[in-house]
Amino acid sequence: MRRYITIVAAAALAMGCVNENISIPSPDTTPTTVVIPEGATAGEVIIKFAPEMEAILDQTMTRSGGEATRSGIPSTDEVLDILGAYSFERVFPIDSANEARTREAGLHLWYIVRFDEGEDLQQAFERLSKLGEVDKLQCNRPIARAYNPNANPMFVSCAEADSHAATRATAWPFNDPEIYRQWCYINDGTAPFATERAGVLAGADAGCAEAWDMCTGDEEIIVAVMDEAVMWSHPDLKDNIWVNEGEELYAGKDADGNGYIDDRYGYNFVRDTGITSWTSNGSTGHGTHVAGTIAAVNDNGIGVAGIAGGGKGKRGVKIMTIQLFDGMNSCSLAMEARAMKYAADNGAVILQCSWGYHSSKSNMIMGYIPGPATEEEWAALYPLEKEALDYFINYAGSPNGVIEGGLAIFASGNEYAAQSSFPAAYSKCISVAAIAADYTPASYSNYGSEVLLCAPGGDLEYYGTPGMSDNIYDEHGVLNQQGAIYSTLVIDGVAGYGYYEGTSMACPHVSGIAALGLAYAKQQHRHFTSEEFRELMYTSARDIDDYFVGEKLYYMRHESAGATPIKMNLADYRGKMGRLADAGALLKAIEGSGRDMRLPNICLAPNTLTSLNLADYITEEAANAEVANSEIATATIEAGVLTISAKSEGQTSLSVTTKSGTKHYATITVRAGADNGWL
């Protein structure tokens, strides 16, 4: 339930200013609607200040060393005095390497205020909303899982998994012994869980068969898994885990200056520490399961396969763990926003998000609390979340890399609802619905016009036998959970494998396909904007509306005796499940799309040098490099690596000639204070 509080702002207040050259905007005298969602944290308000306040705020933060008790703005501080504020700090810590774009995006103007929890939050919002210097207000609150934390997945130990061998008719491309359970990658129509009522159709999968002949991954593509912690030491994941070189666990210092201590494998935004945890009471292994679908190590002779996990002589994509849930606890909205920015600033180009608010059309009788109904309502309720997402979408990647901007991929939700949840439904995100192994919508999946893509997510309510356990023995004499998604898992700190279902499982299929596509684009020397790549994922996906005919029968709470059958009218889902993401079709579409990669311009300081691998930009072997003015800089090529050595300030041109005579050009700028970045 949401509360809407209408406030008529007071007349302009007489306000002093610490700097006579900085004017404070007049307060808005039009009626203002302040929205405080249920579950808002007492004693905390998140404020975005007007741009005119930048100098005052910077001065306050400089004096305080990063955390203060007051803003330095007299009118704001009068209210903070009344509220008993004891903490005033930037939402986003300073990362010197990315501070310029942080300011360009306006994220440096977001602050979190902590005050006496006994103060009425509504009155705090009323007081602050009247201030002309306040641009936006938002509550803080813990984020919620969109999946059931009490689910009990069937668990298979590593030892048991490695004892299995595939005998299925399909010729699998990798030697991972459990790959035969992963119908979601290559579905040949022979899965053992098919029944007369609930069938299996060949091709209802992620399209990996064709894709894996073209590409298996690339270690320079980084996927940020925003979820429970990923078990970075899992035997089937450890070789594909992102490592922040230079940082060490338990060192107690920020070695790379990015504002985060000990973040070697990612960061725990629940406990604000670089030590991520998958053993806390209430941990479900959800993040580890998601990560395995994207990048479990392929062809390593153990466990399962990942869509972009490498193999055939190639390394897989890298998984960055962004911990939003830790046991029974979750991070706040402020920390969630930090997490999104952290992912962009540390090299991730895909946000994998199997969580979100409940759909606005979810049924309250079933225990769901409906979330935002429109993009405008979501943006008004959670403006910080939207701006952090926009930052990732706009600033992740590189204009000189395979993608400029990032892809934010979200599960549509599991509330059986006729609208996607937010943030998935945001028009710049990719909302993912779930299908069963016969192309039909999964019984639980949210759907609607906001959904862009769908992927296998399992459907136990469809394939399960009413009144019986989902755990059955397959043709190998091994326990199998009917029609669910099999991946890496950790339970009670023990690495293994297991089954889950949900749009949470469909989502990483799309993230894995996106990662594989970017790996192939790099292989083909293609460059895309995030918007272009998002559109290509959609147009290359398969239209499956023709399968939505007649009715589908499923049993909610089907393991209980006397479960009631429920009928789905499949025609209701036409045009509302998106298109079926297809790895093979995407890779083929990448050929000839986007634009050629080209040599980036370079800016560096005098008496420094930098280098890059020419194979990332030029398809032919380079023969030599020439700099027009050798007094400014020189260039050499050795083993395909171009090295630029700066001498004195100035600007000059660089040409790289291939063995066939083709020339590639770039500009070299040498100036004091440059950070040696490719532009």
Residue ranges and their predicted role:
Residues V18-I22, D213, G217-E219, E228, ...:
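Substrate-binding/access-modulating region of protease and related hydrolase catalytic domains
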Residues S421-A519:
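Extracellular S/T/G-rich loop segment that most often corresponds to the catalytic His/Ser-adjacent loop
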Residues P25-C158:
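Inhibitory N-terminal propeptides of secreted protease zymogens
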Residues A348-W355, N363, G405, A519-L609, ...:
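C-terminal subdomain of the subtilisin-like protease fold in secreted/lumenal serine endopeptidases
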Residues L13-G39, A674-L679:
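Bacterial Sec-dependent N-terminal signal peptides
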